[in-house]
Amino acid sequence: MVHPHLSRTKRTFFSHSSQMISRHIRKTNSLAFVRALSASETAVTPRRKRTVFTDELNKGPSFEDFVSGKAADVFVDPLEAARKDPEAKLPKWLKVPIPKGRSFHSVKKDVRELKLATVCEEAKCPNISECWGGKKSEATATIMLLGDTCTRGCRFCSVKTSRTPAKPDPMEPENTAEAISRWGLGYVVLTTVDRDDLADGGAAHLAETVRLIKQKAPQILVEVLGGDFRGDLTSCDTLAVSGLDVYAHNLETVEALTPHVRDRRATYRQSLSILERAKQAKPSLITKTSLMLGFGETDEQIMQTLRDLRGIGCDVVTFGQYMRPTKRHMKVVEYVRPEKFDYWKEVALEMGFLYVASGPLVRSSYKAGEAFIENVLRKRKHNVGDSPRLA
């Protein structure tokens, strides 16, 4: 502010000087602000989005790999390679024969006519030709109940998910039982998605289906692969005493990896409690579980899992290779060789498991109607006695 008692000339001089100084200060501050803003933008501005080409390039060997001659040693996922190039060769242990044969096509035709939804086809199971390829009375099919939408989202599974799936069809137990009784199979597996939206997790629906199958065709052996019912042991009891022959519930993986592999609502100990309760509810039941290998588990972790299973009296265990359904799912850490699967089969049998199926392409319902299990079940029904177990 210019003092009022100064002469007009001096006031004018001071006024112009003040304005020039103010402009200089503003200019200096503006430049400093611009420089600071530019520096901050440079620090926080994200890099240009990588192109598909860059992503693909980064998956392969680096420049140093080519210089050192190690480019040929860079691992390429055989399943990913096969998806991109149909001519790419898979390891021999991941190859399966093309489904064919009179029995296979007969079972497939029956599935269509009876309007049954089988996991065998929908999940593109690699063992379908084995399970459907023999005599119809020896064939095994896995029927999906309670819809095709799960309320959980495990990182290995490609089944559709939703918090509010469609309500169960009240006629499904009757229709399924009627269809299966007319089919002529000797062994059937019923499975289901997790239904956390239902008060009992769908236990009553499954139990009613089993009861009606046994009513219409008592000779059919029934296995149910169920969920954990959120740990509700009452729901477990409902299913265990429904008349089924094999109660299956999958652990999927070892305890340390469970939080990373399965939905957060599924816990290792909760699954063990379900298998244990099923045996307590009906001691004559065969209890069964399945483990996938290839998530990065260690031998000691697998051994501890087998000890835990034997500790609760689990009778049957299967081992199979985890295969990534899509790029949105967990990566495969290791493709386990067939020799390792043979090793775990021997270990499990020595620990006292009644039956073990182990191989890269084995799934939880693989050859569920194996003659050995059928014989054990039929002997129990006639009170001939249980098959001996190894100590």
Swiss-Prot record:
EC number: 2.8.1.8
Keywords annotated in UniProt: 4Fe-4S, Iron, Iron-sulfur, Metal-binding, Mitochondrion, S-adenosyl-L-methionine, Transferase, Transit peptide
Domain Radical SAM core: 135-354
Compartment list: Mitochondrion
Class of the enzyme per the UniProt entry, highest EC level: transferase
Cross-referenced SUPFAM superfamilies: Radical SAM enzymes
Pathway named in the protein's UniProt entry: Protein modification; protein lipoylation via endogenous pathway; protein N(6)-(lipoyl)lysine from octanoyl-[acyl-carrier-protein]: step 2/2
Cross-referenced HAMAP family: Lipoyl_synth
Protein name per UniProt: Lipoyl synthase, mitochondrial
Species of provenance: Clavispora lusitaniae (strain ATCC 42720)
